From Swiss-Prot:
Molecular-function GO terms, alphabetical: hydrolase activity, acting on glycosyl bonds; metal ion binding; pseudouridylate synthase activity
The EC number(s) this enzyme carries: 4.2.1.70
Enzyme class: lyase
Lineage: Bacteria, Thermotogati, Thermotogota, Thermotogae, Thermotogales
UniProt KW Lyase keyword: yes
Any GO CC annotation of this UniProt entry: cytoplasm
Record text on cofactor binding: Binds 1 Mn(2+) ion per subunit.
Name recorded for this polypeptide: Pseudouridine-5'-phosphate glycosidase
Cofactors named for this entry: Mn(2+)
Role this protein plays: Catalyzes the reversible cleavage of pseudouridine 5'-phosphate (PsiMP) to ribose 5-phosphate and uracil. Functions biologically in the cleavage direction, as part of a pseudouridine degradation pathway.
Keywords attached to this entry: Glycosidase, Hydrolase, Lyase, Manganese, Metal-binding
Originating organism: Thermotoga neapolitana (strain ATCC 49049 / DSM 4359 / NBRC 107923 / NS-E)
Annotated positions binding Mn(2+): D126
Length: 284
């Protein structure tokens, strides 16, 4: 196994998946987001550890050129299950939330950031590896909830069944990616210090679960849940498996005239800031 860890040991770091850049956004916006996230990390004083696999090598702290190579040459979207296969076969692979959590935990990064996590898809057969990884890795994950295309009720119940702690940052509503409200209630935290107390308590208990910190999309960029659900009802699904989420997200961008893309970029930027604050506080 070849690993290139570019992180400074004593400096706080935030892990970030490569799938959001390579499969989740149009190329232009993906590169702009990467540059913004890097700038935020430099200004705040933490390290942005974009995690991916390039030609079978794990890289912690990917740069813009490497992301561009992955976009140009193509890269498979991988969860935890596929990591050993991608490494052994020398593949280019973009990590999802599950693979990112696994690799960050393996190499000492305590905070991971994403836009929206996976969950249970309608029908109940397709269940994301994100959930099972969160159920077995103690780490802090900052997100804007689960992706709006999922079965919300089933995913919410699965989070409880898998004993995954969930808190809302300055909200008691479980957000749904583009939408601030789901009708599902969560425990509210007011500040980063509360998040740290919960995480430290998890460490004391040796509770090997991910602390899911939910940061709703900024209000000015929200696309309400009802609108998203109505739009999804009219999209004909022409793919299956791992291609479902990127396909539906692209379709929503088209149908909404880019509103969901603006929401996605906005929430990702805010999540990077919150994750950075948490990482810096953890490092003190």
């Amino acid at each position: 196994m070849v690993v290139e860890n570019r992180l400074e040991k004593e400096k706080p770091a935030v892990g970030m998946e490569t799938t959001v850049f390579v499969h989740g956004l149009p190329r232009k916006e993906a590169i702009e987001l990467f540059r913004k996230a890097k700038k935020i990390s430099e200004e705040m004083g933490f390290q942005l550890a974009v995690v991916g696999v390039l030609k079978g090598k794990i890289i912690l702290g990917m740069n813009e050129d490497e992301l561009t190579i992955m976009m140009n040459e193509g890269s498979e979207k991988i969860g935890t299950r596929e990591i050993p296969i991608a490494l052994a076969k020398g593949m280019n692979a973009a990590t999802t939330v599950s693979a990112t959590i696994f690799l960050c935990k393996r190499f000492g990064i305590d905070v991971v950031v994403t836009g929206g996590t996976g969950g249970v898809h309608p029908g109940g057969v397709d269940i994301s590896q994100d959930l099972t990884e969160m159920a077995s890795s103690r780490i802090i994950l900052v997100s804007s909830g689960i992706k709006s295309i999922l079965d919300v009720d089933a995913t919410f119940e699965m989070l409880e069944t898998l004993e995954i702690p969930v808190v809302g940052f300055m909200t008691d509503e479980f957000p749904l990616f583009f939408s601030r409200k789901s009708g599902k209630k969560v425990k509210r935290v007011e500040n980063v210090e509360e998040i740290l107390r919960i995480y430290r308590t998890m460490e004391e208990l040796k509770l090997e679960k991910t602390l899911m910190v939910l940061n709703p999309v900024p209000e000015e960029h929200e696309v309400p849940r009802e609108e998203i659900e109505h739009l999804l009802e009219n999209i004909e699904l022409k793919v299956e498996g791992k291609d479902v989420t990127p396909y539906l997200l692209r379709k929503l961008v088209e149908i909404t005239g880019g509103r969901t893309l603006k929401a996605n970029l906005s929430l990702l930027e805010e999540n990077v800031k919150l994750a950075g604050k948490i990482a810096l506080a953890l490092g003190r």
